[in-house]
C-alpha cells in the first residue's frame, strides 16, 4: 500500500492536461509506441473534435522511481470545462493528491481556481506544475507569483515542464511520488469500494470504475450494493493501462473496473458503496453531493416512432452521466418527448450530439430555461422548469429567479468591456480584486442570463482571455413574465419563453420578426402575435399567396371584378378556418438565438 499513489490532474481548459497524461503514460510504458495516439484518454469522437475532455478516465501505471522502488500510479484525467466540474469532484474523491497544471504563458484562470479549491476542501495534497515552458511567451516566474497570490499555495519550487516536448515530465513523476501521500485504509477490514463512474457496455452490461477504500475485492466474490441491498457476482475485474486488463483481485487503495453482469441501469448508482455480501461493512462511504441541473430543455424525437429508442438511449446515457435528469413530457406542437435537465449549455449541446451520434436519433430541442421558484396566491411554493408549467399571472404572488454567483478572472485592459456586459445582463457587482495584471471580479447575475450566451459574449468581449466559473447562489424575487406566441390565435406551447418584464416587449418583437421569416407563406394570412397574459405586445403577418383573379377580365364591368374578388375573399376565409400551419424545425431554434444577433 505504501507504494500506491492516487492522483488526478486538474487545470483550466487548454492548459495541457491531456498531453501531460499522454507523456506520463509513455514514460511508464503503459502503451507501446505504436498504440500511442495524441490525447489517448479522450476516447470519445466528440472529445477529439472539440479538443475538450468530457469524461474522466482512469489509468493504472507502474513507475520505477529514482529511489529504486516501483510505485503504482493510479491517475484520473479530468475535464476542465465549467459545465463538467462535477466530473472533477467525483474524480478527486478517489484521490489523495492532485497535479495543478498551469500554462506558463496564460497564468491562473478561473477554472484552475475553482478546481483547486475543490481539491483543497477535500484535503488533497496539491502539487503545482508549470506547463508549456517551451513557448516563447512563457514567463514561469510571473505565473509562480500569480499562483501564490491568487491560489495561495507555495509555487516557487513548482516543477517546470513542457508536456509537448517531454522536458521535465520525469521530474513531475518524482515530485508526485515524493509529495502525494499513500492511501490510508485497512486491507483486512470488510470491503468498502466507492463507485466513481459507470458506463454501459453492449456486451458486458454495466461497467463500474471503483476505488477500494478498505479490504480487498476478489474475482468471483458476492458483492452487495449498499443503497439497494442487491447482491451481484463479481464476474470480472481489473485495471486500465488505458487498455482494459483483467486481474484476479483489487487491493486496498487501488482504482480499477468491475463487471458484475448488472443489466439494469439503476443497479449501481455513481457515488454508491460496494461491500462483500458475506462480511458486509457497517456503513456506506460518504458519496458525492447530487448535482442539480441548472438548465432545462425539452427534447423531442422528430418522428414519433423513435420515442422508444430515445427513451432507452437516455437511460444508457444517464448511467454514464450522473448529472443528466429527464422526465417524460408531451407538447401539443411536438408530440411526446422528454424534459431534460443539464448543467449548462455546453453540456446540453454535448448530450444532444451524443444522442444523435451514438444512438442515431433526430431531435428537436426547445429553448432552454432555468428553474423558477413561484409562490402562488394560496401560499404554496412550486418550482417551474418550463414556461408551459407556469401558473396564470393572477395566481402568482411572487416569482423568484435563480441568481448565479460568477467569478471571473481577466486581464486589466478588458475590465471596462466585461463590466458593461455584466450590467447589460442585470448583474450586481459584489467584489473586485487586483492581482498583478489580472483582475478578479465577482458578480451576481441571474442564471437565465448566464445560461443563455454569457460565456460566449464574455469570451468575445475579452478576446478569449477572461475565464468564468459560476455556481447557484439563491432565489431572488424578480419581475419576470411569460411571453406566449400565438399563431392564428392559437398558443404554441413550445415557443413560450420566460423573460424579465423590461426586456419582454423587445424579446417579443424580435421573436415575432424571426418567426415571420421562418414560417413559409400559405394560401391564407398567418397572424403571429406575442402576448403577455391577454395583452398583445407585438404582431406581424405572413402574407397570403393569391392568384390574380382579374387577369382574364380585359375591360369589363366593375361589378364583374367585384364579384370575382369577393368570391376569392370568401374562399380564403373558408381556407383559414380549416387550414393549419406547419411549423418548421428552424422556428423552434429561433428562440435560442433571440437577443444574440441584435445586441
UniProtKB/Swiss-Prot annotation:
Keyword Membrane found: yes
UniProt organism field: Klebsiella pneumoniae (strain 342)
Lineage, uppermost ranks: Bacteria, Pseudomonadati, Pseudomonadota, Gammaproteobacteria, Enterobacterales
Keyword Transmembrane among record annotations: no
Residue stretches making up the tr-type G domain: 2-184
Primary location recorded for the protein, binned into one broad class: membrane
UniProt function note: Required for accurate and efficient protein synthesis under certain stress conditions. May act as a fidelity factor of the translation reaction, by catalyzing a one-codon backward translocation of tRNAs on improperly translocated ribosomes. Back-translocation proceeds from a post-translocation (POST) complex to a pre-translocation (PRE) complex, thus giving elongation factor G a second chance to translocate the tRNAs correctly. Binds to ribosomes in a GTP-dependent manner.
Catalytic reaction annotation: GTP + H2O = GDP + phosphate + H(+)
Similarity comment: Belongs to the TRAFAC class translation factor GTPase superfamily. Classic translation factor GTPase family. LepA subfamily.
Binding site for GTP: 14-19, 131-134
Keywords per UniProt: Cell inner membrane, Cell membrane, GTP-binding, Hydrolase, Membrane, Nucleotide-binding, Protein biosynthesis
Compartments reported by the entry: Cell inner membrane
GO CC annotation terms, alphabetical: plasma membrane
Name recorded for this polypeptide: Elongation factor 4
EC number, as in UniProt: 3.6.5.n1
Top-level enzyme category: hydrolase
PROSITE patterns: G_TR_1 (PS00301), G_TR_2 (PS51722)
GO molecular function, one term: GTP binding
Membrane topology annotation: Peripheral membrane protein
One GO-annotated biological process of the protein: positive regulation of translation
Amino acid at each position: 500500500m505504501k507504494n500506491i499513489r492516487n492522483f488526478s490532474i486538474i487545470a483550466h481548459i487548454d492548459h495541457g492536461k491531456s498531453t501531460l497524461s499522454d507523456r506520463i503514460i509513455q514514460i511508464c510504458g503503459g502503451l507501446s509506441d505504436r498504440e500511442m495516439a495524441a490525447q489517448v484518454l479522450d476516447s470519445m469522437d466528440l472529445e477529439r473534435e472539440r479538443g475538450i475532455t468530457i469524461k474522466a478516465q482512469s489509468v493504472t501505471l507502474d513507475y520505477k522511481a529514482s529511489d529504486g522502488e516501483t510505485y503504482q500510479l493510479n491517475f484520473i484525467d479530468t475535464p476542465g470545462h465549467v459545465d463538467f466540474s462535477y466530473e472533477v469532484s467525483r474524480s478527486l474523491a478517489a484521490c489523495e493528491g492532485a497535479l495543478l497544471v498551469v500554462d506558463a504563458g496564460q497564468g491562473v484562470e478561473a477554472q484552475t481556481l475553482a478546481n483547486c479549491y475543490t481539491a483543497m476542501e477535500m484535503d488533497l495534497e496539491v502539487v503545482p506544475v508549470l506547463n508549456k515552458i517551451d513557448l516563447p511567451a512563457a514567463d514561469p516566474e510571473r505565473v509562480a507569483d500569480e499562483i501564490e497570490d491568487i491560489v495561495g499555495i507555495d509555487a516557487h519550487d513548482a516543477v517546470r515542464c513542457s508536456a509537448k516536448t517531454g522536458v521535465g515530465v520525469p521530474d513531475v513523476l518524482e515530485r508526485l511520488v515524493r509529495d502525494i501521500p499513500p492511501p490510508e485504509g485497512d486491507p483486512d477490514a470488510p470491503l468498502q469500494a466507492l463507485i466513481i463512474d459507470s458506463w454501459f457496455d453492449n456486451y458486458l452490461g454495466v461497467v463500474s470504475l471503483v476505488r477500494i477504500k478498505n479490504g480487498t475485492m476478489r474475482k468471483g466474490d458476492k458483492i452487495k450494493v449498499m443503497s439497494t441491498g442487491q447482491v451481484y457476482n463479481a464476474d470480472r475485474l481489473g485495471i486500465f493501462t488505458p487498455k482494459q486488463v483483467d486481474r484476479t483481485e483489487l487491493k486496498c487503495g487501488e482504482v480499477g473496473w468491475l463487471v458484475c453482469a448488472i443489466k439494469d441501469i439503476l443497479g449501481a448508482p455513481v457515488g454508491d458503496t460496494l461491500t462483500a455480501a458475506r462480511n458486509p461493512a457497517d456503513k456506506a462511504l460518504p458519496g458525492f453531493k447530487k448535482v442539480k441541473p441548472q438548465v432545462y430543455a425539452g427534447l423531442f424525437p422528430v418522428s414519433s416512432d423513435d420515442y422508444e429508442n430515445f427513451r432507452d438511449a437516455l437511460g444508457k446515457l444517464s448511467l454514464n452521466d450522473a448529472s443528466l435528469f429527464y422526465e417524460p413530457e408531451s407538447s401539443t406542437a411536438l408530440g411526446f418527448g422528454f424534459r431534460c435537465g443539464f448543467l449548462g449549455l455546453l453540456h446540453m449541446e454535448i448530450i444532444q450530439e451524443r444522442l444523435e451520434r451514438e444512438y442515431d436519433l433526430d431531435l428537436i430541442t426547445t429553448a432552454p430555461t432555468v428553474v423558477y421558484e413561484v409562490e402562488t396566491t394560496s401560499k404554496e411554493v412550486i418550482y417551474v422548469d418550463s414556461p408551459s408549467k407556469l401558473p396564470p399571472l393572477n395566481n402568482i404572488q411572487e416569482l423568484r429567479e435563480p441568481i448565479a454567483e460568477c467569478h471571473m478572472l481577466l486581464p486589466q485592459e478588458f475590465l471596462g468591456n466585461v463590466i458593461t456586459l455584466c450590467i447589460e445582463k442585470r448583474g450586481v457587482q459584489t467584489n473586485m480584486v487586483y492581482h498583478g495584471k489580472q483582475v478578479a471580479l465577482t458578480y451576481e447575475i441571474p442564471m437565465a442570463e448566464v445560461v443563455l450566451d454569457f460565456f460566449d459574449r464574455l469570451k468575445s468581449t475579452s478576446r478569449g482571455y477572461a475565464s468564468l466559473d459560476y455556481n447557484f447562489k439563491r432565489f431572488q424575487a424578480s419581475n419576470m413574465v411569460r411571453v406566449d406566441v400565438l399563431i392564428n390565435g392559437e398558443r404554441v406551447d413550445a415557443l413560450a419563453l420566460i423573460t424579465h418584464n423590461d426586456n419582454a416587449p423587445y424579446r417579443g418583437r424580435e421573436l415575432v420578426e424571426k418567426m415571420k421569416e421562418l414560417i413559409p407563406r400559405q394560401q391564407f394570412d398567418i397572424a403571429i402575435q406575442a402576448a403577455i397574459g391577454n395583452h398583445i405586445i407585438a404582431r406581424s403577418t405572413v402574407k397570403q399567396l393569391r392568384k390574380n383573379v382579374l387577369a382574364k377580365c380585359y375591360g369589363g364591368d366593375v361589378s364583374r371584378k367585384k364579384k370575382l374578388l369577393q368570391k376569392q375573399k370568401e374562399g380564403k376565409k373558408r381556407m383559414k378556418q380549416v387550414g393549419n400551419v406547419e411549423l418548421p424545425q428552424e422556428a423552434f431554434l429561433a428562440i435560442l438565438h433571440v437577443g444574440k444577433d441584435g445586441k
